[in-house]
């Protein structure tokens, strides 16, 4: 009996991933369609978050990057449920999902107690590279105008494969995220 070496295992994983991509290729970007034999699950809660900078001053303890993946959509920043960067050029926030997933959409809850317009123009990027803090990864969607406290799902034009999801704001501004949900397609049991 032949034993599999690491190379063979990687080949099998890649083939399984390709079959998964083919199986979900009918996913529509403007719908919540989930293919048969698949479920959609927020995998961000399993990950580790980081961001370009922490808000300074007395509020820093209330602005950790992990607060945006704690499963809590509370949009009041003073409750310790939102991430918050400093006001600087090109802020970013990123979650490492700790493994590669097929991602259909990303759901963002905007800050509700103030400043809802700050997130306008943010890019949602998905991929496997940490180059330039994940900013070079392919784009899933762009955040348009969101009202304070709004929760909105951004569908990728096609399912995307990646380990890292980055929210990048290409301007000088604060980046505030009260919840980021990464909706991955997983085979149903």
Curated annotation (Swiss-Prot):
Keyword tags: Calcium, Disulfide bond, Lectin, Metal-binding, Secreted, Signal
Glycoprotein found in the keyword field: no
UniProt function note: Acts as a defensive agent. Recognizes blood group fucosylated oligosaccharides including A, B, H and Lewis B-type antigens. Does not recognize Lewis A antigen and has low affinity for monovalent haptens.
Principal cellular location given in the protein's record: secreted
Region described as F5/8 type C-like: spans on this chain: 40-189
Localization of this protein: Secreted
Gene Ontology MF terms in the entry: calcium ion binding; carbohydrate binding; fucose binding
Any further remark recorded for this protein: Binds 1 calcium ion per monomer.
GO cellular component: extracellular space
Quaternary structure annotation from Swiss-Prot or TrEMBL: Homotrimer.
Family to which this protein belongs: Belongs to the fucolectin family.
Tissue occurrence: Gill mucous cells.
Positions that bind alpha-L-fucose: 84, 111, 118
Bridged cysteine pairs (disulfide): 82-178, 114-115, 140-156
Short sequence motif Cell attachment site: positions: 111-113
InterPro entries registered for this protein in UniProt: BG_Antigen-Binding_Lectin, FTP1, Galactose-bd-like_sf
Gene Ontology biological process: regulation of cellular defense response; regulation of complement activation, lectin pathway; regulation of innate immune response
Coiled coil: none
Source organism of the structure: Anguilla japonica
Domain of life of the source: Eukaryota
Signal peptide (from-to): 1-31
Name by which UniProt lists this protein: Fucolectin-5
Chain ranges passing through the membrane: none
PANTHER family linked: FTP DOMAIN-CONTAINING PROTEIN, SI:CH211-215K15.4
Classification of source organism: Eukaryota, Metazoa, Chordata, Craniata, Vertebrata
Binding positions for Ca(2+) per the UniProt entry: 70, 72, 81, 178-179
């Amino acid at each position: 009996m032949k034993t599999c070496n690491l190379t063979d295992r990687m080949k099998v994983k890649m083939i399984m991933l390709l079959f998964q991509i083919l199986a979900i290729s009918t996913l529509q970007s403007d719908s919540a369609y989930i293919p048969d034999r698949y479920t959609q699950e927020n995998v961000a809660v399993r990950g580790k978050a980081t961001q370009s900078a922490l808000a300074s001053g007395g509020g820093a303890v209330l602005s950790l990057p992990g607060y945006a993946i704690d499963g809590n959509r509370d949009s009041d920043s003073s409750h310790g449920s939102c991430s918050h960067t400093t006001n600087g050029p090109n802020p970013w926030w990123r979650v490492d999902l700790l493994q590669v997933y097929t991602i259909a959409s990303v759901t963002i809850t905007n800050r509700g107690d103030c400043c809802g317009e700050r997130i306008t123009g943010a890019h949602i990027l998905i991929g496997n590279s940490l180059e330039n803090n994940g900013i070079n990864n392919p784009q899933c969607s762009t955040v348009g105008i969101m009202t304070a406290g709004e929760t909105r799902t951004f569908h990728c034009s096609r399912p995307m494969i990646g380990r890292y999801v980055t929210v990048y704001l290409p301007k000088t501004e604060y980046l505030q995220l009260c919840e980021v949900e990464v909706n991955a397609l997983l085979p149903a049991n």
